[in-house]
Amino acid sequence: SGKATRVAIKHEGKNVVPHEGKIITLPITAFELQENTDYYLNLTVCQKEERNYAPAGYEIKKVQIPMQIRKDGFSVRETADKLQVTEGQGVLTVENSRVTAKFSTVFGKLISFGKDGKEYLTEGPRMNVYRATIDNDMYKKEDWMNKYFIQKPVEETEYVSCLKEDDKVIVQIGTFFSCYNQSWGFECDYTYTVYSCGQMKVEIQGKAVQRGKLEPAFLPRIGVIMKGNKNFQKAMWYGMGPGESYVDSKAASIMGIYENTVDGMMTDYVFPQENGHHEQVKWFRIGDGKDGLLCKMEEKLGLNLANYTDESLEKAQHPFEIEKADDVIIHLDYRQSGLGSNSCGEEQLEENKVKLQDFAMAFTVQAAECGTEIREARKQYID
């Protein structure tokens, strides 16, 4: 998936006057491509001489150029002992020596995912359109919260089916998602493919439904929420970083592999609100230093990792009032609306507003020992 290759090229005496350009030939020699690895050219502009406002070498601007070179390689998933399927008291269990996945046939959701009696995911995914209100949402908050009730979702089960094949079990769940007393919503289809090797592929398709005339001008986000083991506090991700990024606020971020704690991924605003989002994430891992959960996306998604829920952010008036959750809260977004500047300026641009729309997202989760995640994330499979 991703690898950071650092090549520093310093040019002395290469002067470019304002409004002009100059061609510089970079002394990059040929190198062997690694399979399933992305390459980027990172250009950094630094302060040449010390000034009152910045020391020499201070980074002024960074630009990242994706290199259109890639070597793809595909593998066949290994197989393990046959998956067993049992059902009782509204719980469907798929398991073998490498994986245990439990589903609620009543509530139409994944209850847990793990192995050897240890839960890596403790709930999810469930669809979500809500984010804790930001300052720039101040003129939308009344409609969102008291007219469309986006903070009060309802997801009803329509069907659950299970199909056993040679080395995998496919669980399909259909739901209807909406918010209290609304005529709009989404017909959702969740397909969980549990492989005997211990991986589980999750495919989610949503079809927008409008049975009336009223709907929000735009939604804060379209995505899903999952919950992870509360002890998985060490995070690594391949996506934009190192700080938070949003669709209209990412000039300071570049693609790379980054590490932090879950708490460290929070942007601690004076007034609690949505924060810590990362755009264009290809994979992430959370772990306890030994065991971890690896999640690989088929297409780039937005990511939030936190030790608190959106509801606790919305409720708190000060950072010390934010209530801790019992799990690691995982947001994966198909799209999240931009930030705009509507507390004192303009709304988000139209292209940065998430409208009621069809969507599709897919990702694969698996247990991965800490230290193996980059190697595991690079693997691509034939199916």
List the predicted regions and their residue ranges.
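Beta-strand/loop-rich accessory regions of lumenal/periplasmic or secreted enzymes
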Residues: N15, P27-N36, E49-R51, I65-D383
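Intrinsically disordered, low-complexity Pro/Gly/Ser/Thr-rich segments with frequent PxxP/GP/PP motifs
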Residues: G2-Y58
